[in-house]
Each structure stands twice: as C-alpha cells, then as structure tokens.
C-alpha cells in the first residue's frame, strides 16, 4: 500500500487526506522521496513541494506468520529551567522593592520552599505493542496489523492511549482479474497538559497545599492577578479535559489485465473521522492566608463544554 505525502497532503491508494496519524509505524515497509520534476508531473499542484511515498506492509506468498513485538521505557526531563529557591527569591525581590523606594516584603506567612517543576513533572512510563498476522496463497493474500501505544507525559495527569489497525487483502479470481481492499483505523485519547508556564513563574515561597485544610495554597498577593498555583492546572483542570478521536480510511479496488502490459484499475476510497472533546471547569477553592478563615473561591461557577465533529470523504 502506498501513502503519498503531497505538499502536506497524504495519498493512500488514491485517497488524499490531511495527515497520516492513523498509521502505525510498525506497519511501514519503506519510504521514498520524489524530488525531480518528471516524477512529480503526475501529481500536479499537489506535488509542488515534493512527494513522500510511504509503503506499508503486505502479505507475501508463504506460510502464515504471526509477529509480536513489545517495548517499554521511561522518560524524564533532565534539562530543566534554572530557577531560584525561596531564600534567593526573597533576597532578589526585596532588592527590587528597596531599589524602587518601597519597604521589604513581609514573608511571615510565606515560609515555603517549593520547586514547582518537581511538583508538576513526573517520570513517564511508555509502552508500544504490535501484533501482525500475514498469510498468502496463489489466490489470496491478507495482512492484519494491530498496535497499542500508551505513553504517560512528563506532566502529571498527562496520558496518551492509541489503538491502530491495518487490514488489507487481495484475491485473484482468475489470472487476469483481482479484487482487494485496504483499511486503516485509529482510536486515540489525547491528554490536556497544563501547568508548565505557571511552574516557571510561581514564587517558591508558597507551599503547594495548606496542611490543615488540604486545599491548594494560593500564591502571594503580588502574583495572584497573573499567576495561579500550577497544581490548579494539572490537578483540577488538566485531569478533567479530554479529547477522543476516531478515524478510518480505506478503499476497495478491482483490476483487470486487458493486455500483457495494460491493466485497468477501479478504486473507491473513503475517509471517516470523528472527534469528541470534553472540557470541565470546576469551582476552585484555595487556601489564602490573607483572608479570614483562609478559604477563598477563585472561580464563580462550574461549567462543562462538550464538542463533537464528524467528517466523511469518499
């Protein structure tokens, strides 16, 4: 099966799509780049920026074979942005205030020493699993490839789940007449990762939580208007925002050998895509030592936004 990437457009057996994210890399047989004008002529304007032909695996005549491969790994961010600790921050911020003619800041209620990057980052686990079954005779061929990818992100609550399928078959009715089909599909759940920007800006003098109430701690008054506690994004918001995508692309074809070097081929192609998203904004309460009772509400209301889109091209 040939996938042809044409100026950011993909062709799969005469079907042009916007990307090939439904392909499992384990099903790719080879890749070829076309650059010369003579090779690109048949693609017209779609090939203006070049063509990449991706050939996926198909069955070969021989015994039925089952291949299984699996891998696991971990990922961690080592090269983090250097930030100040609590004592360094207090010194530098007071220097700024004094140079502006203001009094030093009162840190009595702000005794934390938080590395916010440690709070939102994690060591992510990932696994990639693939199974393929192939078989062929003189009359028929089939190939089935299944894939599953699970990858935890470097940010807590971030997790990707992706299932892929590649199925193709070809049957020879006679020596000159053949039929077949190709089907590729994907089901993917994508995470909503947040909190990195806040982790780089939040003052280290604030603790993550209030020990008595268990509420997420607010930031000092000089930051509250611009920056929230990064855990609000990762624990309260990012954990509730999800999107799920489905996509199926395929075709059926028939071809007949008219003459020795002349073959007629008819193809019907289809591309179906569906996307569902859910965004939940909860009521957010934090601990603020500057208000009576300590408990403060940051948001006025909770809301749920859901979206669904479907497209079909043939």
Walk through the language-model features, giving the residues of each.
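Short acidic/polar hinge/loop motifs at secondary-structure boundaries
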Residues: 2-35
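Outer-membrane beta-barrel channels and translocator barrels
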Residues: 25, 61, 126, 137-138, ...
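A beta-strand signature from Gram-negative outer-membrane beta-barrel systems
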Residues: 25-67, 126-128, 141, 147-152
């Amino acid at each position: 099966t040939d996938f042809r990437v044409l100026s950011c457009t993909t062709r799969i057996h005469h079907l042009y799509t916007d990307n090939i994210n439904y392909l499992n890399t384990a099903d790719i047989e080879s890749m070829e780049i076309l650059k010369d004008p003579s090779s690109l002529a048949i693609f017209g304007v779609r090939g203006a920026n070049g063509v990449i032909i991706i050939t996926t695996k198909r069955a070969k005549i021989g015994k039925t074979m089952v291949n299984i491969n699996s891998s696991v790994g971990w990922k961690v961010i080592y090269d983090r942005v250097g930030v100040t600790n609590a004592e360094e921050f207090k010194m530098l911020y007071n220097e700024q205030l004094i140079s502006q003619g203001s009094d030093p800041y009162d840190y009595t209620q702000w005794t934390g020493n938080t590395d916010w990057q440690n709070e939102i980052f994690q060591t992510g686990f990932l696994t990639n699993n693939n199974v393929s079954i192939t078989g062929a005779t003189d009359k028929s061929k089939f190939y089935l490839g299944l894939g599953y990818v699970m990858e935890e992100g470097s940010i807590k609550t971030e997790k990707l789940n992706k299932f892929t399928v590649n199925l193709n078959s070809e049957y020879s009715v006679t020596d000159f007449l053949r039929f077949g089909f190709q089907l590729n599909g994907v089901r993917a759940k994508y995470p909503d990762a947040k909190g990195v920007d806040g982790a780089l800006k939040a003052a280290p003098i604030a603790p993550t939580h209030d020990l008595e109430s268990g509420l997420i701690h607010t930031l000092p008054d000089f930051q509250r208007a611009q920056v929230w506690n990064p855990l609000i994004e990762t624990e309260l918001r990012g954990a509730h925002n999800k999107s799920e995508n489905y996509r199926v692309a395929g075709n059926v074809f028939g071809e007949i050998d008219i003459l020795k070097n002349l073959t007629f081929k008819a193809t019907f192609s289809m591309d179906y895509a569906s996307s569902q998203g859910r965004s939940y904004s909860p009521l957010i309460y934090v601990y603020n030592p500057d208000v009576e009772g300590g408990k403060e509400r940051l948001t006025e209301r909770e809301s749920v936004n859901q979206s669904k889109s479907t497209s079909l091209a043939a």
